[in-house]
Swiss-Prot record:
Involved in pterocarpan phytoalexin biosynthesis. Catalyzes the last step in the biosynthesis of the phytoalexin medicarpin, and thereby contributes to plant defense reactions. Dirigent proteins impart stereoselectivity on the phenoxy radical-coupling reaction, yielding optically active lignans from two molecules of coniferyl alcohol in the biosynthesis of lignans, flavonolignans, and alkaloids and thus plays a central role in plant secondary metabolism. Homodimer. The gene is PTS1. The lineage of its organism: Eukaryota, Viridiplantae, Streptophyta, Embryophyta, Tracheophyta. Belongs to the plant dirigent protein family. It comes from Glycine max (Soybean). This is Pterocarpan synthase 1. It is an enzyme of class 4 (lyase). The keyword Lipid metabolism does not apply. Its EC number is 4.2.1.139. Induction: Induced in cell culture by yeast extract, an elicitor for medicarpin induction.
Length: 186
């Protein structure tokens, strides 16, 4: 009797552990209908416009007191910046860079970028790439930020984005930034 009770308890324990362990399953991308992994290089221009009737970035928060820097430590900015094929403002629009950046350094001009590049044209229309990273805009001629995800054509995206100034108007604060994005995706 004790022996059969032991086996019943053991079997119930095993059954219970199997039932509770099924909240996940291991999959491969092909089981989800994804094709072979691809590597894509994107090249476009990011227009960060402070001036004019319709700026593409606005200040959300600024530190107390007067600061001599354009973006003093602690400044938070929201952006909805056009992404274009060429550096000209009227160049073909391929998407928007939407997100926030924060001034993160007390010693030099540095930003923490949190943005989604939302594409509105061509093969990648409706797809996004999520970018996160440190952007030391004055001390590094080419800055590199991580691609941490994506949607649509860029599901499971990973890679990096390189940013370099194409032109900057230090008086107004407007900037055109050239981006090269290297992304692995399915």
């Amino acid at each position: 009797m004790a022996k059969s009770t032991f086996f019943v308890c053991l079997n119930l324990s095993l059954l219970f552990s199997l039932v509770t362990a099924t909240y996940y399953s291991s999959l491969t991308p092909t089981l989800l209908g994804f094709r072979e992994e691809q590597f894509t290089h994107l090249h476009f221009f990011f227009h960060d416009v402070v001036t004019g009737p319709k700026p593409s970035m606005v200040f959300i928060a600024e530190p107390n007191g007067k600061a001599k820097d354009a973006l003093p430590f602690g400044t938070v900015v929201a952006m909805d910046d056009p992404l274009t094929v060429g550096p000209e403002q009227d160049s073909k629009l391929v998407g928007k860079a939407q997100g926030i950046y924060t001034s993160i350094s007390q010693e030099e001009m540095g930003l923490m970028m949190v943005m989604t590049m939302a594409f509105t044209d061509g093969d990648f229309n409706g797809s996004t790439i999520s970018v996160l990273g440190r952007n030391m805009i004055m001390s590094e001629p080419v800055r590199e930020m991580a691609i941490v995800g994506g949607t649509g054509a860029f599901r499971f995206a990973r890679g990096y984005a390189q940013a370099r100034f194409y032109s900057v108007d230090f008086t107004k604060g407007d900037a055109i930034v050239e981006y090269d994005v290297f992304v692995n995706h399915y």
